[in-house]
Regions:
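An alpha-helical appendage that flanks or caps ligand/catalytic pockets
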Residues: 1-32, 66-70, 77-207, 238-239
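Active-site and adjacent substrate-binding regions of carbohydrate-active enzymes
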Residues: 35, 50, 201-204, 218-221
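Conserved, mostly hydrophobic/aromatic
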Residues: 38, 51, 106, 206, ...
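Hydrophobic faces of well-ordered beta-strands that scaffold small-molecule active sites
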Residues: 38-41, 57-60, 89-95, 215-217
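Short helix/loop capping segments that flank catalytic or ligand/cofactor-binding pockets
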Residues: 47-50, 101-102
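A conserved active-site cap/scaffold subdomain adjacent to cofactor or substrate pockets
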Residues: 52-64
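Glycine-rich, proline-tolerant flexible connector loops at the mouths of alpha/beta enzymes
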Residues: 62-65, 218-226
Length: 239
């Protein structure tokens, strides 16, 4: 109909409830372009098809540079097959950042943040994501590709499941090493633990390799990590 809203019906929210009060509406300026960017979350086959057909960007888990580069190349190819340009779709992976003035402090921050993750929880994550029950396996036993059962029919994150299975197929880690992997104790997102300068170098390296177009930052462990991201990493990336 071309009618966006009936001005006579637009009024302040003026909500007052048990948990919060808000006058409304949102006090942010309108987006400066004619069309709001569309972002797809997730990199399953269906998600890639959808993103390559309509999205401006995709947010996905890419725990290593090779996975990110493969995803970006695949999305650009799919976009071109659908009559779009490769540059029409951008890859913005999640980036978990544990930042501190020294590498040792950053590693300590990461360890402290994840210290409460129990072995039972890690075992449950592996079982849920891969269908593999490691409860009775010796710590030093290797987990091989041939040990993996067929993928579970239902998983919380199909992308996470695929990434974890791919890592096992590639690295064949020992049980104790698998249970310490970021994909198991945290998430399958790209992880950087170190100084701001190290983070900048890693980001620039991934960008130069054609693995990313940007990233969605998750500074973790402390407010100092947020400060270091905003005050040192972001300005350095703009140089």
């Amino acid at each position: 109909s071309g009618l966006f809203a009936d001005a006579e019906l637009v009024k302040p929210v003026d909500h007052e409830g048990s948990f919060f009060n808000v006058k409304g509406p949102l006090n942010l300026p309108r987006f400066g372009k004619t069309r709001i960017p569309l972002v797809q979350a997730g990199a399953s086959g269906a998600g890639r098809d959808f993103a390559s057909s309509v999205a401006d960007a995709i947010f996905a888990s890419t725990p290593d540079k090779a996975a990110a580069a493969d995803l970006r190349a695949d999305l650009r190819k799919r976009a071109e097959q659908r009559g779009r340009k490769g540059d029409d779709i951008r890859v913005l992976p999640g980036l978990s950042l544990y930042l501190a003035p020294t590498r040792a402090e950053a590693e300590e921050l990461f360890a402290e943040t994840n210290a409460r993750v129990s072995r039972d929880r890690c075992l449950a994550t592996v079982l849920e994501m891969t269908g593999l029950d490691l409860c009775d396996w010796p710590a030093k036993r290797q987990v091989k590709a041939t040990d993996l059962p067929p993928p579970p029919e239902t998983v919380r994150s199909r992308t996470h499941s695929q990434l974890l299975r791919r890592m096992i197929e590639r690295d064949e880690p020992a049980v104790e090493d698998l249970l310490c992997r970021p994909e198991v104790i945290g998430s399958a997102h790209w992880l950087v633990v170190g100084t701001p300068s190290y983070a900048v170098a890693q980001i620039k390296d991934w960008a130069a390799a054609g693995a990313i177009d940007g990233f969605v930052a998750f500074p973790g462990g402390s407010l100092d990590a947020v400060r270091l991201l905003l005050e040192q990493v972001v300005p350095a990336l703009g140089d």
